[in-house]
Swiss-Prot record:
Gene name as annotated: FH3
Domain C2 tensin-type, residue spans: 214-352
Source organism of the structure: Oryza sativa subsp. japonica (Rice)
Gene Ontology MF annotations: phosphoprotein phosphatase activity
Ranges for domain FH2: 827-1226
Pfam families, sorted: FH2, PTEN_C2
InterPro entries: C2_domain_sf (IPR035892), FH2_Formin (IPR015425), FH2_Formin_sf (IPR042201), Formin_homology_domain (IPR051144), Prot-tyrosine_phosphatase-like (IPR029021), Tensin_C2-dom (IPR014020)
Region listing for Disordered, in residue ranges: 443-478, 492-840
Biased composition (Basic and acidic residues): 524-534
Protein name per UniProt: Formin-like protein 3
Positions in coiled-coil regions: none
């Protein structure tokens, strides 16, 4: 046999399986690794060699080992079953190889006690560190010992710091065996308990003394939250057994069963529909390693089904509580779905000196104590309530209570209280554990661990006779103490080196003996438990009102060829589209460009001005280029059309090529009636259909513009009436055909609004500016000299005529040359880019309502004219870019700002901005902040700031990104600098979470302690109130008086929810309830009982507390302490940066553990008192939890007080009425006498 490589398959069973690498613990192809630990392949096989073949197999392997590793010494470690002598020890003794035998389980769990784990680790560490680092350890296990061998090997890897992750290490070793190999030897999944002990090993750096001293504790109770399903009723009948060291009996060093519930048919059955909490009182002292088994006892007492198993050590129970979920307990393979998702096992402990004495049974209200009034006092009630049925109490108090309060304001509260998880409930078990005698000793109740070395040979001791010489052996009782471990180390140190088999010197054989353990785990059985689519809007509703005519705002523009909604009547026509617009969406019509007729003949006429919408708006124009913010201002009023001029003033045709590419100006708004004036200027070609027009003008009044062949006529203005032609989808509706007399070759220009009769046109406004050219269009030539003599468009008198929009993109000169006039100035299109104005975020009105001031402003003309606005002043005050004063700041600073290198951002900009905002709230340098975190200084950082720091801890991707950045780190942004500072601290997020827990710990503990104290006080007040006791007895006597002679009579007590029915039972006159009668009776007979509510001052506050929430808070505190403990252990390897952090955390942990320990004691006491309160009223805590008891009592107290006050008011009114009647009688008597 050779150790050169691993076998290709596990099916080759008997070879030495070579060790595990020092890095990562992975199998190495070479037989000699730094760990120098080898595992026999027989440990991975289920086959059994025929009798006599096993020594031959071992002899062959050992011969090869001595040949290949002649300079090495070997140590054999065997995990054996029971106390019988192993064949491995017999064979290895012949080669002078010492063997240590360990048990393969502890009370059925494949985890060895912590003292044996410590012994194993020290032995391995000592052996591997001697012999010039050439010694080798041979691991072997007998049949069924693989789970223990894998666990101990994992402990060694973590102890030697070759692995750090417990779960990964254990899983890594288990994967060396065939799939399903672990399930063959363990009916339960042992990994949760094994991981718990691996964590014990991994946390050895927390305290200089490891393992810590095993504390003697009293196991108070076991609480199971959320009932697991192990039968057809979705419930279970749990039976708990505890194995460990009997610290009270004579054999304190041996392990046996120290607690067991009575195995009887009357064992309580818990169902999920009845309750969700199982509480089992244990009251058993424990110390050291403890195994807890919970089995489900079927109706057949002999049939047990294993539910779960937990193994733990009391030395690592820091806060007297151990809370585990379904992932932390050993359960049957594949039974995870039998446990609810929120299942939790809580084990509560207290100090051994504080173990509670055996509690007497809780005194109930309806016991031997008598009180209240005799039944003779209720003679009147039988007549008063004769014929009124005393309501039967339901068997299900919770259901009845929910139904009873479904019609009042407390319905929601009681639904939550009754139907929610019922907490801290289980059938009261009065000191079951202390009344059960210990079971008869089994064969394996006592285990003896002994180390044999150099003593006289005997029949009970192992014998080594190499070369015919007998070696002495000495039997040393091993009681699992540290001293014995040290002695074992000394024995191994003195062990001589291995010599050839022919002449080996005498050598001690090391063996840890244990009695044969024939007790098998209980039989494990498993039983299975039984767009909404939004409606499409109509075309009319889908389209919002179109924007006003040019210049339009960017957000309201749509392509002219998109399907428009029916235009609102009367719509003004949109801009005619050019050939360019037919292939792609054209730009929006800017302020009117120079007309097509500018080129051939001077002087060119000014273009038509923008259209002012009157009562309707056209379909949206094509999307425009980006406009400045102030382009959303209201549209200006239209400039007046040109006056009627002679034919000689008609402009010449446009230049060639312009008519097909340049968009035509929009027509002026329609007149209220037909106009005889003829406009100037020629229309351009338009391919897009215009919106519905008004009736066409007479052909005789139109003058055609020459030079535009075969161009369709532009749309005329819409009519004033609310009529419109039907639209044709998807394009806007076409205008009606022109009159027959119209010239088809030369279409007429759109008509302007008529001049008002008898009015004289004012002076013409300045010419319009030039609009920015859309792509693909040919810019028109500039205006010719002498344009001042060109005709100007007039306006009707009385109308506010603003100037055409200024030139776009021409800077301040263009803007300043055209001063605004009234409302028309507000609709500037594309102001200069150098002076972008801040927007006024108003809600624009696109259609003036009839009778509004906006409509009046358009009609009044100059009377309501707004003052002229100086745009230069407006730009200097409301410019988006801060204007710089050249005389003050100069150009040098501007140049330096441009040359300044840009900040490098590696993190997402949104996250970086949020991080910088967060950092501005923490006003301190980053190094100081890191020092405050490491010092756990709560005076510098509060909880909110720490939580924000946790949110902005760098992710793995961000850390890699920053590590790979090779540029100048000083040029990184603030967020990146912050991340770099955090990266200097190992596990900074974990430290921040510990810091956050440190900040909130005091508040959490104080709030929890206050709530627990409130429950205790309320329970004590209720149970010690003599007045409440007498009132309950009075109610019992009252009910028996009403039910006398019926099946409901002669009751010895009543259910607690019957208190709520006192107000539902009314007298025959319907003026009084039984609650009123009770108060009346007490006020007459026992008035001192009326103020019994003063004895229950904490009852209402306790009714608002839920034990389930308290349990969750307790678990959160306990988990937080575990995280603190883990971080403290991990920070040992951080170096100097975490020295102060470890000191501060260790100080906090010591104080916090003491605080939580006292809190756990109070929490356990509260649980017992909450159960006893239900038992005080004769209720089952599982069916009537503490929350329901207190809520019923609070409601009863409030109803009693209300009835008492109503009786007092009624008595006062009757008294006044009697006084008035008496006065009337006196007056009547006087009148009679007179």
């Amino acid at each position: 046999m050779r150790l050169d490589s691993f076998p290709a398959s596990i099916s080759v069973p008997y070879e030495v399986r070579s060790g595990f690498q020092a890095q990562g613990g992975l199998p190495s192809p070479s037989g000699h690794t730094s760990l120098r630990v080898s595992v026999f392949d027989s440990c991975f096989c289920t086959e059994v060699l025929p009798h006599g073949m096993y020594p031959v197999y071992l002899t062959g392997i050992l011969t090869d080992l001595h040949e290949e590793h002649s300079q090495s010494s070997f140590l054999g470690i065997n995990f054996r079953d029971g106390d019988k002598r192993s064949q491995l020890a017999d064979v290895l003794r012949e080669y002078n190889v010492p063997v240590i035998d360990y048990p393969r389980h502890f009370e059925g769990c494949p985890v060895l006690p912590l003292s044996l784990i410590q012994h194993f680790l020290r032995v391995c560490e000592h052996w591997l560190s001697t012999g010039n680092n050439q010694n080798i350890i041979l691991l072997h296990c007998e049949r069924g010992g693989w789970p223990s061998l894998a666990f101990m090997l994992s402990c060694l890897l973590i102890f030697k710091k070759l692995q750090s992750a417990e779960h990964k290490t254990l899983d890594l070793i288990y994967r060396e065996a065939p799939k399903g190999f672990l399930q063959l030897f363990s009916a339960l999944n042992p990994m949760p308990s094994q991981l718990r002990y691996l964590q014990y090993v991994a946390r050895r750096n927390i305290s200089p003394e490891w393992p810590p001293m095993e504390r003697a504790l009293s196991f108070d109770c076991l609480i199971l939250r959320a009932i697991p399903s192990f039968d057809s009723d979705n419930g279970c009948r749990p039976l708990v057994r505890i194995f460990g060291r009997n610290i009270i009996g004579k054999n304190a060093s041996t392990s046996n069963m120290i607690f067991s519930m009575p195995k009887k048919k009357t064992l309580r059955h818990y169902r999920q529909e009845d309750c969700d909490v199982i509480k089992i009182d244990i009251q058993c002292p424990v110390q050291g390693d403890v195994v807890l088994e919970c089995v489900h006892l079927d109706l057949d007492p002999e049939k047990e089904v294993m539910m779960f198993r937990i193994m733990f050590n009391t030395a690592f129970i820091r806060s007297n509580v151990l809370m585990l979920n379904s992932d932390d307990i050993d359960i049957v393979w594949g039974s995870k779905d039998q446990y609810p998702r929120n299942f939790r096992a809580e084990m509560l402990f207290c100090e051994l000196g504080g173990i509670s004495p055996a509690r007497p049974p809780t005194a109930t209200l309806n016991g031997d104590m008598k009180g209240g009034l005799p039944i003779e006092a209720f003679s009147a009630v039988q007549e008063l309530f004769n014929g009124v049925d005393w309501m039967e109490s339901s068997d299900n108090a919770a259901f009845w209570l929910l139904k009873e309060f479904s019609a009042n304001s407390l319905q929601e509260k009681f639904q939550k209280l009754i139907l929610s998880d019922m907490e801290e409930l289980s059938k009261f078990q009065a000191k079951v554990g202390l009344q059960i005698p210990l079971m008869s000793p089994l064969d394996s109740d006592e285990e003896k661990y002994s180390v044999a070395s150099d003593s006289v040979s005997s029949s009970e001791h192992e014998k080594v006779q190499p070369g015919g010489n007998s070696s002495d052996s000495e039997n040393i009782n091993h009681d699992l103490t540290t001293e014995d471990t040290a002695s074992m180390g000394n024995v191994l140190v003195n062990t001589p080196s291995v010599l050839p088999p022919t002449t080996p010197p005498p050598c001690g054989s090391l063996s840890i003996l244990s009695t044969d353990e024939n007790q098998l785990p209980p039989e494990v059985q498993h039983e299975s438990p039984s767009d909404r689519k939004l409606p499409s809007p109509s075309p009319t509703a889908a389209a919002p009102p179109p924007p006003p005519p040019p210049p339009p705002p960017p957000s309201g523009n749509k392509p002219a060829f998109s399907p428009p909604p029916p235009p609102p009547p009367p719509p003004p026509p949109p801009l005619p589209q050019s050939n360019y617009a037919s292939s792609q969406p054209p730009p929006p019509p800017p302020p009117p460009p120079l007309p097509n007729c500018l080129v051939p003949s001077p002087p060119p006429p000014p273009p038509p001005p923008p259209i002012l919408p009157n009562r309707s708006v056209p379909p949206p124009p094509p999307p425009p280029p980006p406009l400045p913010n102030h382009s959303v201002l209201p549209p200006p009023p239209p400039p007046p059309p040109p006056p009627s001029l002679p034919n000689r003033l008609v402009p010449p045709p446009p230049a060639p090529g312009i008519g097909n590419k340049f968009p035509a100006p929009p027509p002026p708004p329609p007149p209220p009636r037909s106009s005889s004036r003829t406009p100037t200027g020629a229309a351009t070609s338009s391919k897009g259909p215009p919106p519905p027009p008004p009736p066409p003008l007479p052909p005789a009044n139109r003058t055609n513009g020459p030079g535009v062949p075969s161009a369709p006529p532009p749309p005329p203005p819409p009519p004033p009436a609310n009529r419109s032609n039907g639209p044709s989808a998807p394009a806007p509706p076409l205008p009606p055909p022109l009159p027959a007399a119209a010239n088809k070759r030369n279409p007429p220009a759109p008509p302007p609004p008529p001049l008002m009769t008898g009015k004289k046109a004012p002076a013409p406004p300045p010419p319009p500016p030039q609009a920015p050219k859309p792509p693909g269009t040919v810019p028109p030539p500039p205006p010719l000299h002498g344009a001042s003599g060109r005709p100007h468009p007039p306006s009707s008198k009385g109308l506010n005529a603003p100037a055409p929009p200024p030139l776009l993109g021409r800077g301040r000169e263009a803007t300043g040359s055209a001063k605004g006039r009234g409302i028309g100035l507000a609709q500037q299109s594309n102001p200069p880019k150098k002076a972008s104005l801040k927007p006024l975020h108003w809600v624009k009105v696109t259609r003036a309502m009839q009778g509004s001031l906006w409509e009046d402003a358009q009609k009044q003309g100059n009377q309501a004219r707004a003052p002229d606005i100086d745009l230069s002043e407006l730009e200097s005050l409301f410019s988006t870019a801060v204007a710089t004063n050249a005389s003050e700041k100069g150009g040098t600073k501007r140049g330096s700002a441009i040359s300044k290198p840009e900040i490098v951002h590696l993190v997402d900009m949104r996250r970086a901005n949020n991080c910088e905002i967060m950092l501005t709230k923490i006003k301190m340098p980053l190094p100081d902040m890191i020092n405050a975190i490491l010092a756990l200084d709560t005076s510098v950082l509060d909880n909110d700031q720490v939580e924000n720091l946790i949110k902005f801890c760098p992710t793995k991707e961000e850390i890699e990104m920053l590590k790979n950045y090779n540029g100048n780190k000083e040029m990184l942004g603030k967020c990146e600098q912050f991340f770099l500072e955090l990266m200097k601290v190992p596990r900074v997020e974990s430290k921040l979470r510990v810091f956050a827990f440190r900040i909130t710990f005091s508040t959490q503990v104080e709030e929890l302690r206050t709530n627990l104290t409130t429950i205790n006080d309320a329970t004590k007040e209720v149970k010690e109130s003599l007045k409440l006791r007498q009132i309950m007895q009075t109610i019992l006597t009252l009910g028996n008086a009403l039910n006398q002679g019926t099946a409901r009579g002669s009751a010895v007590g009543f259910r607690l929810d019957s208190l709520l029915k006192l107000s539902d039972t009314r007298a025959r006159n319907n003026k009084m309830t039984l609650m009123h009668y009770l108060c009346k009776l007490l006020s007459e007979k026992l008035p001192e009982l009326l103020d019994f509510d003063k004895d229950l001052i904490h009852l209402e506050a306790a009714s608002k507390i839920q034990l389930k929430l308290l349990a969750e808070e307790m678990q959160a505190i306990n988990k937080g302490l575990e995280k603190v403990e883990q971080e403290l252990a991990a920070s040992v390897n951080d170096g100097a940066i975490s020295v102060g952090f470890r000191e501060a955390l260790k100080s906090f942990l010591d104080a916090a553990e003491a605080e939580v320990r006292s809190l756990i004691s109070l929490y356990s006491e509260v649980g017992r008192n909450a159960d006893s309160l239900a038992q005080y009223f004769g209720e089952d805590p599982a069916r009537c939890p503490f929350e329901q008891v207190t809520s019923i009592l609070v409601i009863f107290v409030n109803m009693f007080k209300k009835s008492r006050d109503e009786n007092a008011r009624t008595a006062e009114l009757e008294k006044k009425k009697l006084e008035k009647d008496k006065e009337k009688a006196t007056l009547s008597a006087k009148k009679v006498l007179e």
